[in-house]
Amino acid sequence: MSMGTPHAVMVMGLPASGKSTITKSFADRGYLVLNRDAAGGRVRDLVDPFKRRLLAGRDVVLDNTFVTLEHRAPFTEAARKLGVPLECHWMQTSFEDCSVNACGRMFERYRWVFMTASDIKDHPEASEDPNIFPIAVLFAMKKKLEGVKKKGVWEVPCGKPTMDEGFSRIVKFAEPA
């Protein structure tokens, strides 16, 4: 628990980029973890628990993809209104490494190297596992994070985090060498 002002961290990045590994290091230091995968529901459903924990003086770490400004905004706004600094820890693991990590996770848990959406749906355990997803999900998330420009116009706005959103700092985690 914090002495004085609580501290908040948002860990973001593509699926299978290592967010939960970084989040665990905060949990080990006493931060309360909020994660949509564990809580179920939608990202916006975490806003009220986030506020309550900060109001109680607790340090909080948010663990989710947060690849769009729209998903981050309710949390940056809540932290700003409560006067709590919110750091963004951005996992910049490459798309290729995230793909390898996701396939490795599928194999480790279910002995499948690659699962399609229908394979996952039909598998009794994988269908209930929020950390198992078709690779198409990675493509969609990458598109949201990087944005898509056609003829100089953003067709899909860039979702990369900026200091203008209200973060106290942005820490970029490069992929391992």
Map each language-model feature to its residues:
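Hydrophobic helix-cap positions at the C-terminus of alpha-helices
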Residues: 26, 53, 78-82, 148
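Conserved substrate/cofactor phosphate-moiety recognition/catalytic segment
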Residues: 9-12, 17-71
